[in-house]
UniProtKB/Swiss-Prot annotation:
Similarity-based family: Belongs to the universal ribosomal protein uL3 family.
Species for this entry: Oryza sativa subsp. japonica (Rice)
PANTHER family to which the protein is assigned, alphabetical: 60S RIBOSOMAL PROTEIN L3-RELATED, LARGE RIBOSOMAL SUBUNIT PROTEIN UL3
Example of a GO cellular component annotation carried by this entry: cytosolic large ribosomal subunit
Main location group: cytoplasm
Keyword tags: Cytoplasm, Ribonucleoprotein, Ribosomal protein
Composition skew (Basic residues), residue ranges: 18-31
Ranges where the record places region Disordered: 1-36
InterPro entries noted in UniProt: L3_arc_euk, Ribosomal_L3_dom_3_arc_sf, Ribosomal_uL3, Ribosomal_uL3_CS, Transl_B-barrel_sf
Keyword Transport: no
Domain of life: Eukaryota
Localization terms from the record: Cytoplasm
GO molecular function terms listed in the Swiss-Prot or TrEMBL record: RNA binding; structural constituent of ribosome
Name this protein carries in UniProt: Large ribosomal subunit protein uL3
Record gene name: RPL3
Length: 389
């Protein structure tokens, strides 16, 4: 490394190999927060859809810092989170070889949007999914069998999770009709309490504010924006070769020694970039907006302008946010409309940054398509006045 003054071991992290397309479109929760029996039963994760980004102005609460009581401007992401519907329970047993599925119980009525998930082509299918299972609830023998399955869970299970799905029909920005289905772990209380808690919410909605609170630190799991097949300079960040290099300069000149007579996995190579499964830790919830309530609006204690959270002209490539939403500090994985999994933090947050109370002064709702100057349509009309017809 003759051109460097200091050491630089390599370009690009090897911790995320292989850099290949994710096998799943929705982020998978590979580990849930640690269970605490002393706490009441609660769900540990949720599913949302990325709408877009805007920025806010707030006052910093950091005694002793030069920024204390000063205004700061920060980027935020809006994630639309319509209520989930619980349609099942699944129990797991801890074994020496890891978790093993014990049994599962489903609700009687499953909507069309979740039954679509069990077919590749809904239009050409016979649409028979769960028709036999639903008949169990109509007979005494079937009801008895379901109760026996629940009792079996209470007796043998180590972990209980609910099966929940999104209400994608409420999403105005998405054309997809197939709901996203996932397992969500129930933490708190005894196993019997967890089974009763999950069974109690069969075919009922769970809003986002039942899982997360304002100022909470959460993790976001999702699949990044896909970039396709790209070269080594973009994919790994290696240095471009000098201008006079023969046969291209956006390359790795030496891909290894003669022996061992193979290319090492540590050498930067061209290939797939993006559409990788990633987990982002410690994203702070700045605001929870509830549909049909004042919290859904973008007005604050300092800015009483009547305006909705959706910017003028809608979020580019998404549209209007009509349902519940979360406002998260910073960015988040994936493009617009991408489904993201939201999980409670695995660690107990003790830092001053995590415990800081957020008081928003201003939420920007100017157009995100171009250089937005106005916060509302009325403001724009007042500025321009009556235009010639």
């Amino acid at each position: 490394m003759s051109h460097r003054k200091f050491e630089h071991p390599r370009h690009g992290s090897l911790g995320f190999l292989p850099r290949k397309r994710s096998s799943r479109h929705r982020g998978k929760v590979k580990s849930f927060p640690k269970d605490d029996v002393s706490k009441p039963c609660h769900l540990t994760s949720f599913v949302g859809y990325k709408a877009g980004m805007t920025h806010i102005v707030r006052e910093v609460e950091k005694p002793g810092s030069k920024l204390h009581k000063k205004e700061t401007c920060e980027a935020v992401t809006i994630i639309e989170t319509p209520p989930l519907v619980i349609v099942g329970l699944v129990a797991y047993v801890k074994t020496p070889r890891g978790l093993r599925s014990l049994n599962s119980v489903w609700a009687q009525h499953l909507s069309e949007e979740v039954r679509r998930r069990f077919y590749k082509n809904w239009c050409k299918s016979k649409k028979k999914a769960f028709t036999k299972y639903a008949l169990k609830y109509d007979s005494d023998a079937g009801k008895k069998e379901i109760q026996m399955q629940l009792e079996k869970m209470k007796k043998y299970a180590s972990i209980v999770r609910v099966i929940a799905h999104t209400q994608i029909r409420k999403m105005k920005g998405l054309k997809q009709k197939k709901a996203h289905l996932m397992e969500i772990q129930i933490n708190g209380g005894t196993i019997a309490d967890k089974v009763d808690y999950g069974y109690k919410f069969f075919e009922k909605e769970i809003p986002v504010d039942a899982v997360f609170q304002k100022d909470e630190m959460i993790d976001i799991i999702g699949v990044t924006k896909g970039k396709g097949y790209e070269g080594v300079v973009t994919r790994w960040g290696v240095t471009r070769l000098p201008r006079k290099t023969h046969r291209g300069l956006r390359k790795v000149a030496c891909i290894g020694a003669w022996h061992p007579a193979r290319v090492s996995y540590t050498v930067a190579r061209a290939g797939q970039n993006g559409y990788h499964h990633r987990t982002e830790m410690n994203k702070k919830v700045y605001k929870i907006g509830k549909s049909g309530q004042e919290s859904h609006a973008a007005c604050t204690e300092f800015d009483r302008t009547e305006k909705d959270i959706t910017p003028m002209g809608g979020f580019p490539h998404y549209g209007v946010v009509k349902g519940d939403y979360l406002m998260i500090k910073g960015c988040c994985v994936g493009p617009k409309k991408r489904v993201v999994t939201l999980r409670q933090s695995l660690l107990k947050q003790t830092s001053r940054l995590a415990l800081e109370e957020i008081k928003l002064k201003f939420i920007d709702t100017s157009s995100k398509f171009g250089h937005g100057r106005f916060q509302t349509t009325d403001e724009k009309q007042r500025f321009f006045g009556k235009l010639k017809a």
